[in-house]
């Protein structure tokens, strides 16, 4: 008598496609996934609890290590929360430097996603091109703050350092170069028949499902939901810039790809306008006490990171350390839909779907 048995298969925690210590336990029948269970926590460091014993400025380097592919947005959200509680007015030059740093970081983050996602499904050359352009951005950020990955650049009240001489001009020159390369990326990949067969119609979910799972970022917008905090709840100086919010319609891996690729172009628009409007002089840090004490009370702020809505809740009892600190980490929420997406899929689509969700494990585990 012929019989079949379901097999348990571990993907990770050490697996090249997970880009971090992430384990996925899948139950397969032949090549069809019957069940998928994410196992997280391998990179948990207790950031929120540690923060309760740190001064506010000391917390900033810890945020670098959550979403380490987009550290600038993490820096900003903690500073923004404290500034909101203190009612600080940020110098204009500092705001422009913050926006430039965050949008360059957004482009760099999407380049890592583009290159590694394609590498995982079998395309080697895009990975090399993506890291070539990312290296240029990392060099620009290195000139700005002296670090390549964990920047520790922003401060409550502004930024730590002003832009060095010639830096704005280098950023200005980078924009047309990156646009040219982006067109080349589309020629290389976006119309490729093999690639389209791997992503179109794969990993579909509806707008209602995306909202019920609390998805955000490109994982939400790919379903047609036009929601981006830079437009819908503008913070910093984003209301001064003219840019569009890319949205999809089907909610599959292809729509997620298109949304992120178009986001690179929109970030280039913001960078271009920020360079044109950049103040010629001015302070980069507001007058704040050396030891910052947030007033008693609570504050919650949220901003748009490359992976979605990152939020920061602070409860203060008036001391130099927060009484309670809580981050809303978008990768953690985006990951929750993965079991639904994988159920019933061919195992060959697993890596395509996982890469399309674009999680960072430092952010998932916290």
Swiss-Prot record:
GO cellular component: plasma membrane
Superkingdom of the organism of origin: Bacteria
UniProt keywords, alphabetically: Cell membrane, Membrane, NAD, Quinone, Translocase, Transport
InterPro entries per the UniProt record, alphabetical: NADH_Q_OxRdtase_suD, NDH1_su_D/H, NiFe-Hase_large
EC top class, as a word: translocase
Role played: NDH-1 shuttles electrons from NADH, via FMN and iron-sulfur (Fe-S) centers, to quinones in the respiratory chain. The immediate electron acceptor for the enzyme in this species is believed to be a menaquinone. Couples the redox reaction to proton translocation (for every two electrons transferred, four hydrogen ions are translocated across the cytoplasmic membrane), and thus conserves the redox energy in a proton gradient.
Protein name: NADH-quinone oxidoreductase subunit D
Lineage: Bacteria, Bacillati, Bacillota, Bacilli, Bacillales
């Amino acid at each position: 008598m012929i019989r079949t048995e379901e097999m348990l298969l571990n993907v990770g925690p050490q697996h090249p496609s997970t880009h971090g210590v992430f384990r996925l336990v899948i139950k397969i029948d032949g090549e069809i996934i019957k069940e998928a269970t994410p196992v997280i926590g391998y990179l948990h460091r207790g950031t929120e609890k540690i923060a309760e014993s740190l001064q506010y400025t000391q917390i900033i380097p810890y945020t670098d290590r959550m979403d380490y592919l987009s550290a600038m947005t993490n820096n900003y959200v903690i500073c923004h929360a404290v500034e909101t509680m203190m009612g600080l007015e940020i110098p204009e030059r500092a705001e422009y430097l913050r926006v430039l740093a965050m949008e360059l970081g957004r482009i760099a983050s999407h380049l890592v996603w583009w290159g590694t996602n394609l590498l995982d499904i079998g395309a080697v050359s895009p990975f090399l091109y993506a890291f070539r352009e990312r290296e240029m951005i990392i060099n620009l950020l290195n000139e700005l703050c002296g670090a390549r990955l964990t920047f520790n650049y922003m401060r409550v009240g502004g930024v730590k350092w002003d832009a060095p001489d010639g830096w704005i001009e280098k950023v200005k020159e980078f924009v047309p170069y990156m646009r040219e390369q982006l067109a080349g990326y589309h020629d290389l990949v976006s119309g490729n028949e093999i690639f389209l067969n791997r992503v179109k119609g794969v990993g579909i979910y509806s707008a209602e499902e995306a909202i019920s799972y609390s998805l955000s970022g490109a994982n939400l917008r790919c379903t047609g939901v036009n929601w981006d905090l830079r437009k819908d709840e503008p913070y910093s100086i984003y209301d001064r810039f003219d840019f569009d919010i890319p949205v999809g319609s089907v909610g599959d891996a292809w729509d997620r790809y298109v949304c992120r690729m178009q986001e690179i172009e929109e970030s280039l628009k913001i960078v271009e306008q920020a360079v044109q409007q950049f103040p010629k002089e001015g302070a980069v840090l507001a007058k704040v006490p050396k030891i910052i004490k947030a007033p008693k009370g609570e504050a919650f702020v949220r901003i748009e990171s490359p992976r979605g809505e990152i939020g920061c809740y602070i409860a203060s009892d008036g001391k130099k350390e927060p009484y309670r600190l809580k981050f809303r980490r978008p990768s953690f929420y985006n990951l929750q839909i993965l079991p639904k997406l994988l159920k019933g899929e061919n195992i060959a689509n697993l890596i395509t779907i996982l890469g399309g969700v674009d999680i960072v494990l430092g952010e998932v585990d916290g």
